[in-house]
């Protein structure tokens, strides 16, 4: 949120610099993302008074002699502008000056005449008419007659200001306004807060009745409206235009500007309905009907449902509650009567409607964080005061204030100074705590027994209990008063990565070496993702923990598998034109012992890998598995297993030391056909997935490092091309080969071939064998005997022939 320094000064007598205030705000829990000086990029630009002018013959230029005070009383500068006259004061960028955008001004010749700088327009200084009148004229910016030559230009044109870009956290909706930040600044500096004027007087009766009703008080706890007649559209005063411009808004008209100004200043969204366009002069706050439509002020049409709250007239919706008004009831140059609305809408309703429709606004941003029920009264009063002050219309006596019946009461918290200090872990003087709370507009009633009855301001809905009071105290008292200490239960460590973290890092590096990139997904999805994988209802993966307040229905359960998230990432990549890739994710899944949960679920660390692309195959994923096995000095075995989402003939379960680690294989043809991707992608894509229980994998790893010397003798490799039945698995062949001799240290599959020349139901698999002996050099005879034994075992056990 952008907050001008000059606007804050209207509410608080600030006696520190903007930079000092930035530090104080940060120390009190407000993150100033950026402190923006308005004169950024401007240097050595001063007020210059034109004392001589002469047209330069044969050119469009005018030679000027400019009085720049202490910088020189007769500086010669040529300009192409024609809107100035003798005696005018204008911005003069002198030799060596800079302008916004990194523009550097140097003395140079223009059409053969020396020019020692540049006379500037408002645009060249980054100004517009809302910031300084006359800035958008074609030509030079003409300054006030009483401007003093040689004065720095910034204070003359209002560029001696700063914008605080503050990140407002979700628990402080009361700070979503200039007044809200000013309130905090007043407390920080120990200064009084000067509230904006909110007095007004009704001057006439309504010319006709208006009906206002709220059918959904659960979604609209308070709805206020006031009727104003004889609307007089016009231009806003300079101060209001400047306020809006500093916050990034352009002035439109006096009445529209008042609604925007109230939003920025008070944090209260408001809307004005043109009563001449409101059918039946009726306003009804209700849930939308199924299929009802509205066109908003930005000319977008939306189809609504009962989950959306709308403001309606006697015939149709005229506004999306808390988000944006309808185009059918907006102000224009013919508007003569307005109904001003200020309300409190349920934050969840506004958030869900905004997300569902993809429609956001400054109003919805504030309602989503929360607007307290007292805010509409203050916001409406401020707006009506401005209506009267700027003579925009005649305020009538007709006003509505509809509530859900709940009383507007301050929250009371009974506590003791000892409790607050106990939370902080330090002793803060009682009177200091009382002073801090009172500066923050809390009231503290000290009881006879020494306890405190503290009442929170109406706008502080985030304050619920005494730890919240402790937070308020320490924010103002200073976190630097808390001495760093160890927890009683804490153990001292040497720092750095622990064993588990090192193993995770090693795993990631092993996969990265195989060409895999790390993915990171949300910890929740929906049952639709499990449906997509054809997971049966009785499967343990269906025993998912439901979120009570999901961000959306698509994110309504805690994940029990990583594979659905990985498949979503792959599909998103394919939709965006990424035709190939290798990904992995290491993250927990959440497994409940029973539902509904009665204890914390087990967060089981899991590893998921995915590969997609026309050239990817089964052995891409198997190669990743083997890389993990080799990296951790393990031996994996593979067995056939049916998995709902994997191809029955191109998948396997992974085992280590008798433990089942997980599964991997090709996505089933049926699921591949159901993916929301183009048909040509479905036909050409190969998608392979694998998911391992990472905790089970790590339980197989021997954490003790042992020295294993390299053999001083050369290893020997032999390749075997074997023909076997389709039903014979790669794992069976590898296992048989390894058991033939202790000299065989490694077996790798490097090719699979199927063809008519092999015969029906046959395939060829080519393996590379590595033979090594750490104690002696292997002879050719040993190699031949070993290979012969391998082939004999393969033929006897599996019926395999050499090709």
What do these predicted regions represent?
Residues 1-202, 206, 339, 358, ...:
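Phosphate-backbone binding interfaces of nucleic-acid-interacting proteins
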Residues 2, 20, 438-442, 462, ...:
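A carboxyl-terminal module marker
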Residues 5, 23, 53-55, 189, ...:
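Glycine/proline-enriched, intrinsically flexible loops and inter-domain linkers
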Residues 33, 47-78, 246, 259-328:
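Conserved mixed alpha/beta core segments that line enzyme active sites in large multi-domain catalysts
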Residues 39-43, 200-202, 455, 491-492, ...:
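Beta-rich nucleic-acid/ligand-interaction surfaces
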Residues 114-130, 135-140, 154, 162, ...:
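Mobile "lid/hinge" segments at catalytic clefts and subdomain interfaces of large enzymes
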Residues 185, 189-214, 391-420:
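Terminal amphipathic helices with adjacent charged low-complexity linkers/tails
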Residues 413-579, 718, 770-774, 782-803:
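Extended, well-folded interaction surfaces typified by the phenylalanyl-tRNA synthetase beta subunit core
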């Amino acid at each position: 949120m952008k907050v001008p320094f000059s606007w804050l000064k209207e509410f608080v007598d600030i006696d520190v610099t903007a930079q000092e205030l930035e530090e104080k705000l940060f120390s009190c829990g407000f993150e100033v993302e950026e402190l923006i000086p308005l004169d950024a990029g401007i240097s050595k630009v001063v007020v210059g008074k034109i004392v001589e002018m002469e047209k330069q013959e044969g050119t469009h230029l005018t030679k000027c002699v400019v009085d720049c005070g202490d910088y020189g009383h007769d500086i010669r500068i040529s300009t192409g502008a024609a809107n100035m006259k003798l005696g005018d004061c204008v911005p003069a960028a002198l030799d060596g000056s800079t302008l916004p955008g990194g523009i550097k001004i140097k003395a140079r010749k223009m059409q053969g005449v020396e020019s020692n700088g540049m006379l500037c327009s408002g645009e060249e200084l980054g100004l517009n008419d809302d910031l300084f009148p006359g800035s958008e004229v074609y030509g030079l910016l003409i300054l006030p007659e009483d401007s003093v030559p040689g004065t720095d230009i910034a204070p003359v044109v209002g560029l001696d200001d700063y914008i605080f870009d503050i990140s407002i956290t979700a628990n402080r909706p009361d700070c979503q306004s200039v007044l809200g930040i000013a309130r905090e600044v007043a407390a920080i500096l120990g200064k009084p807060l000067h509230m904006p004027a909110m007095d007004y007087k009704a001057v006439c009766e309504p010319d006709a009745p208006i009906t206002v009703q709220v059918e959904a008080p659960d979604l609209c706890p308070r709805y206020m409206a006031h009727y104003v007649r004889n609307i007089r559209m016009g231009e806003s005063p300079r101060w209001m235009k400047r306020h809006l411009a500093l916050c990034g808004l352009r002035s439109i008209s006096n009445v529209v500007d008042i609604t925007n100004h109230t939003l920025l200043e008070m944090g209260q969204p408001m809307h004005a309905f043109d009563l001449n366009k409101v059918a039946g002069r009726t306003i009804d706050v209700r849930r939308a009907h199924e299929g009802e439509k509205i066109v908003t002020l930005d000319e977008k049409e939306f189809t609504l449902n009962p989950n959306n709250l709308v403001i309606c007239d006697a015939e149709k919706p005229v506004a999306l509650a808390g988000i944006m008004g309808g185009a059918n009831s907006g102000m224009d140059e013919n508007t003569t009567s307005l109904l001003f609305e200020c309300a409190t809408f349920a934050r969840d309703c506004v958030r869900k409607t905004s997300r569902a429709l993809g429609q956001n606004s400054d109003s919805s941003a504030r309602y989503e964080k929360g607007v307290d029920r007292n805010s509409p009264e203050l916001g409406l009063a401020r707006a009506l005061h401005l209506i009267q002050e700027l003579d925009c219309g005649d305020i009538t006596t007709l006003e509505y204030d509809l509530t859900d019946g709940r009383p507007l009461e301050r929250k009371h918290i009974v506590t003791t100074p000892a409790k607050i200090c106990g939370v902080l872990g330090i002793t803060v003087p009682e009177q200091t705590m009382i002073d801090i709370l009172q500066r923050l507009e809390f009231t503290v009633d000290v009881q006879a027994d020494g306890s405190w009855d503290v009442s929170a301001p109406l706008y502080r809905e985030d304050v619920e209990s005494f730890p919240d009071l402790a937070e308020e105290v320490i924010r103002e008292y200073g976190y630097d008063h808390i001495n760093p200490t160890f927890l009683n239960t804490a153990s001292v460590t040497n720092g750095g990565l622990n064993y588990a973290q090192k193993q995770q890092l090693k795993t990631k590096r092993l996969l990265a070496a195989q060409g895999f990139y790390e993915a990171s997904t949300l910890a929740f999805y929906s049952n639709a993702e499990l449906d997509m994988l054809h997971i049966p209802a009785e499967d343990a993966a269906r025993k998912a923990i439901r979120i009570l307040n999901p961000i959306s229905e698509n994110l309504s359960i805690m994940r029990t598998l990583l594979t659905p998230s990985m498949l979503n990432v792959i599909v998103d990549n394919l939709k965006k034109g990424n035709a190939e890739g290798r990904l992995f994710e290491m993250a927990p899944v959440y497994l409940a012992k029973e539902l509904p949960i009665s204890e914390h679920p087990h967060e089981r660390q899991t590893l998921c890998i995915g590969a997609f692309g026309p050239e990817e195959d089964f052995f891409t994923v198997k190669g990743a598995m083997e890389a993990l096995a080799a990296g951790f000095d393990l031996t994996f075995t593979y067995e056939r297993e049916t998995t709902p989402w994997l191809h029955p003939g191109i998948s396997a379960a992974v085992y280590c030391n008798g433990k089942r680690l997980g599964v991997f294989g090709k996505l089933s043809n049926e699921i591949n056909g159901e993916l929301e991707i183009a048909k040509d992608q479905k036909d050409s894509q190969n998608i392979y997935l694998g998911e391992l229980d990472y905790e089970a994998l790590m339980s197989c790893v021997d954490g003790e490092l042992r020295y294993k010397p390299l053999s001083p003798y050369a290893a020997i490799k032999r390749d075997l091309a074997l023909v076997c039945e389709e039903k014979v698995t790669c794992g069976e062949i590898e296992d048989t080969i390894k058991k033939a001799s202790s000299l065989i240290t490694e077996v790798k599959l490097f090719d699979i071939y199927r063809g008519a020349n092999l015969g029906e139901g046959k395939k060829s698999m080519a393996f590379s064998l590595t033979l090594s002996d750490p104690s002696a050099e292997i002879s050719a005879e040993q190699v031949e005997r070993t290979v012969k034994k391998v082939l004999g075992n393969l033929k006897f056990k599996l019926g395999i022939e050499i090709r």
